[in-house]
UniProtKB/Swiss-Prot annotation:
The lineage of its organism: Bacteria, Bacillati, Actinomycetota, Actinomycetes, Kitasatosporales. Catalyzes the oxidative phosphorylation of glyceraldehyde 3-phosphate (G3P) to 1,3-bisphosphoglycerate (BPG) using the cofactor NAD. The first reaction step involves the formation of a hemiacetal intermediate between G3P and a cysteine residue, and this hemiacetal intermediate is then oxidized to a thioester, with concomitant reduction of NAD to NADH. The reduced NADH is then exchanged with the second NAD, and the thioester is attacked by a nucleophilic inorganic phosphate to produce BPG. The active site is at C153 (nucleophile). Coiled coil: none annotated. It comes from Streptomyces avermitilis (strain ATCC 31267 / DSM 46492 / JCM 5070 / NBRC 14893 / NCIMB 12804 / NRRL 8165 / MA-4680). SUPFAM superfamilies: Glyceraldehyde-3-phosphate dehydrogenase-like, C-terminal domain, NAD(P)-binding Rossmann-fold domains. This is Glyceraldehyde-3-phosphate dehydrogenase 2. Pathway: Carbohydrate degradation; glycolysis; pyruvate from D-glyceraldehyde 3-phosphate: step 1/5.
Length: 335
């Protein structure tokens, strides 16, 4: 069954999602997009992308549509999600990727408008469930979970790392630092922002800021509640990030044991989500990688047997958008 999808918010994640489903060949039809920009801009930014390059498709537009390789997509410009006529278009799933309507009460407006499910491309509030594929999708109940969060790109990276460590060695506590590409929430040049660090020029500074990714890991691995925390360091790259995770484990381990556990997981139950490399890679090497996390085995450290430091890379846009496509298929196949 082809899954009929509407996208609310055609920014970085909305457009990456569109490209990812085309590349995957997923059985998903985008029937409508809602975005406050005009269609000329929407079409142009879909066709041309600084990071991903030019879309290998013909893209045209009218006042209220964009057409990609002959497939016409309706474009709305509604500020209130309740005003988007998803029901008239028989939309199954809405991708809520504005970054604004992350509360359940707001996201549910899409369901009031006729959609069956809403997938939020961000951490959410009061959502029915947060899912990180490869970690907790077995908890999904289609009968009662209608507003679903895909968590954050960083949680999608750190949760598989934490899962492997906890299942194999037991996590006592942990601290995480994500070395994260800058995003549209930052400033190109110094300009006011509620976070005074993010008010500083993104391409000229290493910027410490907050992240809820470590704590959010407990949403998908409840046994880790209260055991993990972390910070983010925003760095001057447009995409390509890394998570540095330091944990105390419950028994003595070696570097080889840790690496072996990750290699086994990457080739087994987490295949497609967790990748494993022994190559000396850097951030640009991860751009365009669809994995949630690429485990860098050369960077593993163990001190005094129980203190473990590991590193996982992720394309914070492309990897995350591929998981959003996968989650659409996962949820859509159970409608």
């Amino acid at each position: 069954m082809t899954i009929r999808v509407g996208i609310n918010g055609f920014g970085r994640i909305g457009r990456n999602y569109f490209r990812a489903l085309l590349e995957q060949g997923a059985d998903i039809e985008i029937v409508a997009v809602n975005d406050l920009g005009d269609t000329a801009t929407t079409a142009h930014l879909l066709k041309y992308d600084t990071i991903l390059g030019r879309l290998k498709a013909e893209v045209t537009h009218t006042a209220d549509t964009i057409t990609v390789d002959g497939k016409t997509i309706k474009v709305f410009s509604e500020r209130n999600p309740a005003d988007i006529p998803w029901g008239e278009l028989n939309v199954d799933i809405v991708i809520e990727s504005t970054g604004i309507f992350t509360k359940k009460a707001d996201a549910e407006k899409h369901i009031a408008g006729g959609a069956k499910k809403v997938l939020i491309s961000a951490p959410a509030s009061d959502e029915d469930i947060t899912i990180v594929l490869g970690v907790n999708e077995d908890k999904y109940d289609p009968a009662k979970h209608n507003v679903i969060s895909n968590a954050s790109c960083t949680t999608n990276c750190v949760a598989p790392m934490a899962k492997v460590l906890d299942e194999n060695f037991g996590i006592v506590k942990g601290l995480m630092t994500t070395i994260h590409a800058y995003t549209n929430d930052q400033r190109i040049l110094d300009f006011p922002h509620k976070d005074l660090r993010r008010a500083r020029a993104a391409a000229e500074n290493i910027i410490p800021t907050t992240t809820g990714a470590a704590k959010a890991t407990a949403l998908v691995l409840p046994q880790l509640k209260g055991k993990m925390d972390g910070i983010s360091m925003r760095v001057p790259v447009p995409t390509g990030s890394a998570t540095d995770l330091v944990v105390e484990v419950s028994r003595e381990v070696t570097k080889d044991e840790v690496n072996a556990a990750f290699k086994k997981a990457a080739e087994g139950e987490l295949q497609g989500y967790l990748s494993y490399t022994e190559d000396p890679i850097v951030s640009s090497d991860i751009v365009g990688d669809p994995s949630s996390c690429t485990f860098d085995s050369a960077m593993t450290m163990v001190m005094e047997g129980t203190s473990v430091k590991i590193l996982g890379w992720y394309d914070n846009e492309w990897g995350y958008s591929n998981r959003l496509v996968d989650l659409t298929v996962f949820v859509g196949n159970q409608l």
